[in-house]
Amino acid sequence: MPGGGPAMDDYMETLKDEEEALWDNVECNRHMLSRYINPAKLTPYLRQCKVIDEQDEDEVLNAPMLPSKINRAGRLLDILHTKGQRGYVVFLESLEFYYPELYKLVTGKEPTRRFSTIVVEEGHEGLTHFLMNEVIKLQQQVKAKDLQRCELLAKSRQLEDEKKQLSLIRVELLTFQERYYKMKEERDSYNDELVKVKDDNYNLAMRYAQLSEEKNMAVMRSRDLQLEIDQLKHRLNKMEEECKLERNQSLKLKNDIENRPRKEQVLELERENEMLKTKIQELQSIIQAGKRSLPDSDKAILDILEHDRKEALEDRQELVNKIYNLQEEVRQAEELRDKYLEEKEDLELKCSTLGKDCEMYKHRMNTVMLQLEEVERERDQAFHSRDEAQTQYSQCLIEKDKYRKQIRELEEKNDEMRIEMVRREACIVNLESKLRRLSKDNGSLDQSLPRHLPATIISQNLGDTSPRTNGQEADDSSTSEESPEDSKYFLPYHPPRRRMNLKGIQLQRAKSPISMKQASEFQALMRTVKGHEEDFTDGSPSSSRSLPVTSSFSKMQPHRSRSSIMSITAEPPGNDSIVRRCKEDAPHRSTVEEDNDSCGFDALDLDDENHERYSFGPPSIHSSSSSHQSEGLDAYDLEQVNLMLRKFSLERPFRPSVTSGGHVRGTGPLVQHTTLNGDGLITQLTLLGGNARGSFIHSVKPGSLAERAGLREGHQLLLLEGCIRGERQSVPLDACTKEEARWTIQRCSGLITLHYKVNHEGYRKLLKEMEDGLITSGDSFYIRLNLNISSQLDACSMSLKCDDVVHVLDTMYQDRHEWLCARVDPFTDQDLDTGTIPSYSRAQQLLLVKLQRLVHRGNREEADSAHHTLRSLRNTLQPEEMLSTSDPRVSPRLSRASFFFGQLLQFVSRSENKYKRMNSNERVRIISGSPLGSLSRSSLDATKLLTEKHEELDPENELSRNLTLIPYSLVRAFHCERRRPVLFTPTMLAKTLVQKLLNSGGAMEFTICKSDIVTRDEFLRKQKTETIIYSREKNPNTFECIVPANIEAVAAKNKHCLLEAGIGCVRDLIKCKVYPIVLLIRVSEKNIKRFRKLLPRPETEEEFLRVCRLKEKELEALPCLYATVEAEMWSSVEELLRVLKDKIVEEQRKTIWVDEDQL
């Protein structure tokens, strides 16, 4: 046939075109098929229909080049594509059987479940014979399972009896423990009361001594004033007497002056005296002249007369002398008289003064006697009141002891009655178990046909117990054998369970890594299964991986629910299909999962299918579940709390860049872009570099999609646009760390667009520096630790403390999820010793562990108050169980856990609890911040839409915005040449310390800031235009304020500005490029008495300590570091001032590290 060749070729081409058309329909839906198809379910049926052989099946299921389920499904479609039309028909029949929705999506037809291919291959008789053989095998397996179930039930009953006995012992021990704790609490409360009473007594004694001293000082002052008054009175009296004496003397003188002769009389007497003297002289001259001329007789007469005259003169002289002597005696007598008069007046003055003093002292003695009588009356009244108070107090103590004794007796009686009641209940339970065993023995169960067991026993066993499945024991915390009274008197006992059974039931939570559409489909599927759960009993071994069908079936995980749904219908028979199915359902490990295990951050981002297979965080998180239940909360609530705590962790690695944006920074002809499939892109290329040098392609897998897209070694990646974890995002890669770039490329799916440029020079420079040992990667940034890291406990090589600053050199050191970092010298910024620390995500887990230890501490002696708080929260949460569940978005238990977690955060944030519980190894710094760290604005906008969608659906959304677990804070170094201002905390000590520093010879180094005095209007205007560091209202219309210019003026003088403001102004100062030195003076119970001289006003020690701890808590939110003056560093005020000066000098030399995210 010469013309047959072209016709046959046309026919073959037509068949090929038809096959290609059929497979094009499948390829159009390849994404959905590879996403939902499980190759392990289809390969038995495909092998039964002889479409694939054992080699193909082994390649699909076990090839190391196919790490994920999507890759395996894609490979299976490629193999079926090579089988032509037959492969297409058999593939559609398998979809019709296993995935009717996907069959309808591909063909647009409803599934009919008629399988012509297997009938054609085997024939009706062969198929019937094969099915009968399989049914017989299954029946035999069911019988064996039933026998095993009966044995397990008997053993379970025996274990339950032992459990009841242990529960009884446990309840007794808990009762005694509760009594012990209660008595311990009473003792502690009494001790606290005693200490408080002692303190009050001490304060009263101090107050009494102070008042007594003040009273004595007042009495002494009163006495001094009284003496001064008496002296003034005495002086007044003396002056009055002197005044009277002077007045008398002045009157006598006045009388003498008045009685003296007048001037005319004196002149007249003087003229008479002159006349007499003239006459005498005349007479004498006449007598002498007469002597010469008189005769002798006359001379004799004259001599006689002269003689008589001389005698008369002598007599007269004697009389004159006598008169003079008498006058002298009179004068002396008058002098004596005057002297005696003066003495008399003095004596009279003294007498009157003494009389008045006597009257004054007499009055004072009377006043003192009256005061003494009043004091005696007050003393007698005080003694009487004291005796009455002591009598009343002793009576109250006697009554209190009597009531306490009665309470203790009643409590003991109550405990004994409770123990007796528990014992009786235990006896009842034992008798009931014995009765059930006897009824079982009398029932004559046929062990050879266990499927004929009574329906009641089967319902009891299937309803509450589950066999061991997949090496895992189901939850058997409650059985149908327990009476209603058991739950009333026996405390709930939660045995230790594996993490897989307690993983978060996330189906009712809208905010999930799976899409909303998938969640709704899973809910619909689970409602369908729930409708048939009463009629369905899965006996096939293929269902061994699913959870038991119980009332809580709707709370299973999505992947497990899907597995159970798919195991409802019977599997098509095939060689070793059951064994292969069991192996397929078992958790297997692939290369991606091994990579996830090696990189801790991948564990944070597992999808819902694999999310429950791996423990979240370090083992210490999961091992604490047993201690959780001792607090009285059930395991589900605690698991919800753990899930909510995990929601605070970042969904992406740490991003240190503050300049990265959602656009290509280097626009121009050098920037190129390519579009390729992002699935498995991370396996096609390797990356090199980091945030400091850029992300470069180090190698490209030959023949891969990346190579065909034009990506080569040395290309610098700039921007990635596409679907990342189900969200359309635009991520800049030029400023990403090595860890973040790898994470982004590993999480992308579908078509993505990569912007890159050829930068061989930068790539060669990076390689050369790495070969020379100058750098280890392209990462370089500085972080401040917010928790303590121990090299022995946290699986790293470097031990660091909270607030240490390190230089991160590599975010994926040796391709592991560890950061290589160097300790930074605080003075020179040089790198010191190097080592590894946990990555950001693992550090979040460590921080979470410390918070969980803080909350769920089992040692009650360390956390009695935490125990009471959790118990009170437990009691508060009880009414939440009655919430309505009509809204599918609301879960009562989730609301309960949310409310509990909100109260828990308040409990953790209280400074008193933190200081009681945090030791040196558990110190953490809880700060508020953006969950994405320093993410750029465009990246925030990209995630804003998703946040708005889930804002109403997420019950923890508001809680998530209030707290972010930030183990590392990105910091930036600043250097200050000028002297920095100084702030003191507690602020109440600032004024005293500033004055003492200035008075202790520090005026050359320190000074206070001169404030501006402005009016109210000027102050309001200044508030709007300038940054006010400190302000104070002097009077209703005048304000005193300090602005940064005032502080800079002090710094210009090369002096430290001592501020009395609080630490709330630190952010404003840093924003103004002024970097203060913050000094914390540590206050504790041991050194609180040393601060009495420093406090401006007297305060109680408890109030002062509480305020100081609140101030210490505020220091955690500061964007910069602070210096601490410990209590052991000083013992007196002088030593404190010396230590403060040394600290200021030391801090001035240090580098300033600022967390700009906290500004």
Swiss-Prot record:
Residues 450-671 are annotated as: Inhibitory domain (ID). Gene3D superfamilies: 2.30.42.10, Death Domain, Fas, P-loop containing nucleotide triphosphate hydrolases, SH3 Domains. The modification Phosphoserine is found at S448, S466, S512, S540, S564, S598, S649, S657, S891, S930. Residues 441-496, 532-578, 610-631 are annotated as: Disordered. Residues 540-554, 620-630 have a biased composition (Low complexity). InterPro entries: CARD, CARD_CARD11, DEATH-like_dom_sf, P-loop_NTPase, PDZ_sf. Its main location: cytoplasm. Phosphorylation at Ser-564, Ser-649 and Ser-657 by PRKCB and PRKCQ leads to a shift from an inactive to an active form that activates the NF-kappa-B signaling. GO terms for biological process: B cell differentiation; B cell proliferation; canonical NF-kappaB signal transduction; CD4-positive, alpha-beta T cell proliferation; homeostasis of number of cells; lymphocyte activation; positive regulation of B cell proliferation; positive regulation of canonical NF-kappaB signal transduction. Residues 978-1145 form the Guanylate kinase-like domain. GO terms for cellular component: CBM complex; cytoplasm; immunological synapse; membrane raft; plasma membrane. Residues 672-760 form the PDZ domain. Residues 473-484 have a biased composition (Acidic residues). Keywords: Coiled coil, Cytoplasm, Disulfide bond, Immunity, Isopeptide bond, Membrane, Phosphoprotein. GO terms for molecular function: CARD domain binding. Signal peptide: none annotated. Residues 457-472 have a biased composition (Polar residues). Pfam families: CARD. PANTHER family: CASPASE RECRUITMENT DOMAIN FAMILY, CASPASE RECRUITMENT DOMAIN-CONTAINING PROTEIN 11. The linker region, also named autoinhibitory interface, is less inhibitory on its own than that of CARD9. The linker region together with the inhibitory domain (ID) are required to prevent constitutive activation and maintain CARD11 in an autoinhibitory state. Disruption of the inhibitory domain (ID) region triggers polymerization and activation, leading to formation of BCL10-nucleating filaments. This is Caspase recruitment domain-containing protein 11.
